[in-house]
Amino acid sequence: MKFSFSPIRLLSLLIMLCVMTGCVRLTMAWADLTPDRPGASPAALGPFDGKAAVKNPEEWHERSVLLRDAFQQHVYGVLPERSGARVINRRLVTDSLLDGRAQLEELTLEVWTSFDSDTENTATFNLLLATPVDVDGPVPLILMETFCPNHNTILHPGVTRPQGGGGCDGEGIMADVMTYVFGRYIATPPLAEIVDRGFALATLYPSEFVPDQADAGLAALSRLSQGHTDDMTRWGSIAAWGWGFSRVLDVLVSEPSVDAERVVLYGHSRYGKAALFAAAYDVRFAGVIAHQSGTGGAALNRHKQGESVGDITRAYPHWFSRQYATYAGREEAVPVD
């Protein structure tokens, strides 16, 4: 049997193999359903930073402040001292989404950070808001960040396309690879089911304000953190994307169609990490759906299989603080887990 491949097909096959082998190494490490390895160390309620073990809710409140500070200092980087968001443009994309069962709006948000008293740094991104039309009163909402631009996440020709498009455009083998790697509902949510169950859906493409690329991402993080002088604890994109979730909620609290006390975050992989981060630092969120959040997310640094601190910080130097990278090969030294 004789096979013939064009140069384009050979290149596509090579890219597919690289994507898949990287995916196996980084995101498909198997997990034992009955693990017997040690738990988190130090224990969340045990002695920590010279403090005795937690014995009541009041002591837990004090402990949680210490833990959040430690995660900023050693893993994710430091959050802004002050920040906020405002809607600078809003338009109705369609009032007949899903055969008239929902309406779709596009909001442009301007968000800002301040790491000192003198500097204010801004960025903008678009938010899609799909709300059911035949439901009385404010509705609960699922808020998600995705790998694909908004026009790929909710398919409607009226949705704005970001400059440069995105990795989810096109047809053929690479589009198939994207779907295979990320799954049906990672990039394109089950919108009809969400709306039919009485939920609203809001989605954003976080690469609009912090690109998921090493050089471009680090440059954006630097611009947004002007006023922060310690490069070792400058925030990474996981913290910035998580912060972005909170800025969306700043806007949603004034949205009459949304019950801002019932907003649930959703994210896969890196955006699962961001969703967990956001919920840990912002108590306004009602819940989190973090799918395969892995290292730097729900997985422990110590006693784990698959992706290590060294693996993830070398492959994605923009995701975490530079301080986290210093724990490569010595995960037991990370003060929190």
Task: Show where each model-derived region lies.
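Alpha/beta-hydrolase fold nucleophile elbow
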Residues: 258-269
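Mobile cap/lid helix-loop segments that gate and shape the active-site cleft of serine hydrolases
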Residues: 290-337
